């Protein structure tokens, strides 16, 4: 009971954060609000506290039998669900069949185990396309810029990326060099026209 009480307190604290994010970005398509619990009932109890925050709240559950049971119930009530901790195509299939709006394969963590994280995104995307699944593939645990491009190339619908990767996506040595050349040419032109 102590753990359940602690989980409930965390959920209330997280609820305030999710509410604040939802208020700042009211038209954002989806904000994933994670629930925890050992049983589907515990997850559903926490989800109930989060659903009414706004229409852009998506309930995030783990890819476990109890998480998929909660996913099934939530999706039947037309609540968007993100099934997370996906490490195989088989798990993604189960989540999709349970009504998941999104599945979140963990690209970086798959690579950590010497498997092909991008290959996993491609396999899931191909299976979903073949069967006309409505579930979207959300590539998670992205750690490098190239993984973003590759994930989208092989069929990811969405990528969640840390801010350091997002910032690196803007940077390229040739862009910096090009800006230096433009600046130098502009100063030269101003000098020639006598406008400096």
Task: Map each language-model feature to its residues.
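Single conserved hydrophobic/aromatic residue that forms the stacking wall/gate
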Residues: 1-12
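Alpha-helix-loop-beta-strand connector modules within alpha/beta enzyme cores
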Residues: 15-31, 68-79, 117-137, 183-193
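Catalytic cores of alpha/beta
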Residues: 42-46, 70, 88-98, 143-157
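Catalytic beta/alpha-barrel core
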Residues: 9, 32-39, 56-65, 80-93, ...
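Glycine-enriched alpha-helix->loop->beta-strand junction motifs that scaffold or abut catalytic
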Residues: 53-57, 73-82, 97-104, 153-159
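Acidic (Asp/Glu)-rich catalytic clusters
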Residues: 15-28, 48-53, 96-99, 153
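C-terminal alpha-helical cap/extension of soluble enzyme domains
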Residues: 128-196
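Glycine-rich phosphate-binding active-site loops on the catalytic face of alpha/beta enzymes
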Residues: 9, 85, 102-113, 156-175
């Amino acid at each position: 009971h102590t753990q359940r009480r602690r989980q409930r307190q965390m959920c209330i604290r997280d609820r305030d954060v999710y509410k604040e994010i939802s208020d700042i970005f009211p038209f954002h398509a989806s904000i994933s609000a994670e629930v925890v619990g050992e049983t589907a009932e515990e997850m559903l109890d926490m989800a109930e506290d989060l659903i009414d925050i706004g229409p852009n709240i998506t309930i995030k559950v783990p890819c476990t039998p109890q998480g998929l049971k909660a996913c099934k119930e939530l999706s039947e009530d037309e609540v968007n669900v993100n099934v997370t901790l996906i490490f195989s195509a088989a798990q993604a299939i189960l989540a999709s069949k349970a009504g998941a709006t999104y599945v979140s394969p963990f690209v970086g963590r798959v690579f950590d185990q010497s498997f092909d994280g991008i290959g996993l995104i491609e396999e899931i995307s191909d299976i979903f396309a073949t069967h006309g699944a409505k579930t979207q593939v959300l590539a998670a645990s992205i750690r490098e810029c190239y993984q973003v491009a590759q994930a989208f190339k092989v069929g990811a619908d969405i990528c969640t990326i840390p801010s350091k990767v997002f910032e690196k996506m803007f940077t390229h040595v040739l862009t910096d060099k090009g800006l230096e050349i433009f600046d130098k040419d502009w100063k030269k032109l101003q000098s020639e026209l006598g406008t400096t």
